[in-house]
Amino acid sequence: MVCASSDLYENVSDMHILVQGYEWGPGVPKIILQLKEEVSSVSANAGSVTTAGQARTVTDIYTCDANGQKTEGASDYIAIEMATSSQNAGSPLVYDGAALHYKWADTYPVKVECPQLVVDGENYTYSASVDCIDKQICPDTERFSARDAFTGTYLNSFTGEEEEMTLHTIAYEPESLAGGEKNPLVIWLHGQWEGGEDPDITLLGNEACALARDEIQNYFTAGNETGAYVLSIQCETFWMDEGDGTNGLGSGISKYTEILMDTIARYVESNTDVDPNRIYLGGASNGGYMTVNMLVNYPDYFAAAFPCCEAYSFYEFGRNANGSYKIDASAGYSLQAVELTGNRWMTDEKIEAIKNVPMWFTLAINDGTVFPKAFGLPTYQALVQAGADNCWLSVFENVVGTDDPAASYAGHSVWVYLFNNQITGVQDRDKIVAAADDNFGVVPTNAGGGTLSADGHSNLYEWLNAQSK
């Protein structure tokens, strides 16, 4: 029986937020109250919750463990679960317009007002306001337990001077793989918004943390072992930074090219459980550019690559006398804003150098950020016309979510399909080889990105697992 009294509930010792990776970025689906003493049951009949100034809809309240997982029986934690969508996620990340990166919010105020909290049959009121920016629980990033940085001095070809550079790394190293078979390594290169000095952001900004979840890990095998190492690497500016500190246009060489190779090599050398013949490189947007850039510069190192919405330009863009790109701001964000020199940046020599590397490209035909007809499509066509026979392309019509089925994302966000494990089909290479117009022979489809299979494999990850030097 519920008592008529409504005393102030004073059994709460602390409050945390659960941060989770979603297809749109991080969200906060739960508030976790740490208690001074265990309770067996809890419910709430009314109340309100706001996180970071947004009103949230409470969907459930229950006893839980320290990570917010529902428990049966007594516990010294209570979870307040909230509806979470792309429009109301309560993200603790904010976009820094000056740096062109995500960063953690300076504060994350959480306010809970509960006039009818029922705990073990007793009626209470509960009210609290807590800044939770430093009170985060995030299993999605905590499983990436190996954090490091690599610093070295390299020639900046733009300035002509030596420059000290640092790359930050974060790795998923499952204990179940240690000491047995040599296992594959999946390397992830982030997009523009995830640069900086906190590699956790590379996992949450676009759900790269999914690479360590069972659904994807289960595709990777070595002998009787299941799983892969995952290494996410973060640069402090942009992978497309050619040395002037700006986000380049993709027809140049990244200033991070050498240090990235050294960072990868050091990780592989220091982790003897990694199979050097099964190193898979992938990235999206800026990271897709860098994936192709690394193949061009180190074509014999990687066993396979999976660039998404890659921004390595097929064409060479004109430059000013100081080396910066010529851009006509009056033309807006379009190909008309840049000057084409008439030369190719993805030359025949580069195509020949990388055509034997197993590759799987993914893009959405409505990408309005990295235009497919100037980047991924002509590059892919040149590869298959040159005889690349283990090179695949998935093309989607647009980007629709599953974490939030009502959400429709910008066409550039095709990594949503990658991390949702929805890249299952490929385009017809013969039609692309024969195409003579700017449609490149592709037939976009949201049913896996294509109607054919890649050498009989069911999806990108199964194909990736089969690749070895």
Language-model-derived ranges and their functions:
Residues 185, 192-258:
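Active-site machinery of serine-nucleophile hydrolases
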Residues 180-181, 243-285:
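Gly/Ser-rich "nucleophile elbow"/oxyanion-hole loop immediately N-terminal to the catalytic nucleophile
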Residues 27-44:
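A short glycine/threonine-centered beta-strand motif
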Residues 360-469:
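C-terminal catalytic histidine-bearing segment of alpha/beta-hydrolase fold enzymes
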Residues 2-30, 53-183:
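A domain-start/cap signature at the N-terminus of enzymes
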Residues 202-217, 290, 294-357, 453-455, ...:
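Mobile cap/lid helix-loop segments that gate and shape the active-site cleft of serine hydrolases
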Residues 91-93, 181-182, 196-204, 241-248, ...:
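Short, solvent-exposed loop/turn and secondary-structure capping segments
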Residues 189-191, 309, 363-364:
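The conserved beta1-alpha1 loop
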